Amino acid sequence: MKNSLLLYAEDETNGEASTCGRILIFLSWVLVVLTMPFSLLVCFKVVQEYERAVIFRLGRLMQGGAKGPGIFFILPCIDAYARVDLRTRTYDVPPQEVLTKDSVTVSVDAVVYYRVSNATVSIANVENAHHSTRLLAQTTLRNTMGTRHLHEILSERMTISGSMQLSLDEATEAWGIKVERVEIKDVRLPVQLQRAMAAEAEAAREARAKVIAAEGEQKASRALREASEVIGDSPAALQLRYLQTLNTISAEKNSTIVFPLPIDILTYFMKSKEAFVPNA
């Protein structure tokens, strides 16, 4: 019984509001007719190709959704409208101090590209869609970075940007906002951490250089051993190497006089050494 009385009271209130609204609309039309043609300057409005107009009549959204682009008509005194820009906007997220998952404090900033996808919803569902989106972008940046390790933040920016874009787009859909893109601009580390990372990188480079030098010396010693074996097995190769050495020494501009030993004597000494080693 009580619910029936409440429903009856609501219907009666709506009926009275509807009757009052019809009277005000009629009076507004009378005002337009009486003030012709000056009223036309007030009644006709123009919105651009990239804009839409959300019209309220007596505080209620008009049927048919947002108007535009082009000319639309409003009644004076009872109609109000809001222009909504549909173009893509950019928002530079200010640097946010974030504590990463491995307890490192970093400063991160980003840029967000977004636009209004539903003009009516962006006006009716939220007081200031742009301001709300910007605040949400800051909190989303902090929350996303707080779940990542430092090496992930430095090496997986594209993945993190995509994750932020999906989170923002899902949250702002109820506001009539479409988040098109999110980009991580810069990740600033503490000075002490930068120095430690630079020292670590320098030590790693020095270690790699030492390994490469050791491998080079090993290959060179192996090549020298193989060359000495070839020269020892071939007297002609020994003589050719001897002549190359004499040619190199004589080509240098110095005052040193070199008296080369005959190759036969060198061969004799080498054979004597080979004969001495087995006897030992």
From Swiss-Prot:
It is a single-pass membrane protein. Its main location: membrane. PROSITE patterns: BAND_7. InterPro entries: Band-7_stomatin-like (IPR043202), Band_7 (IPR001107), Band_7/SPFH_dom_sf (IPR036013), Band_7/stomatin-like_CS (IPR018080), Stomatin_HflK_fam (IPR001972). It is found in: Membrane. GO terms for cellular component: plasma membrane. Keywords: Membrane, Transmembrane, Transmembrane helix. This is Band 7 protein AGAP004871. PANTHER family: BAND 7 PROTEIN-RELATED, PODOCIN. Pfam families: Band_7. It comes from Anopheles gambiae. The chain crosses the membrane at residues 23-43. SUPFAM superfamilies: Band 7/SPFH domain. SMART domains: PHB. Belongs to the band 7/mec-2 family. The keyword Protein biosynthesis does not apply.
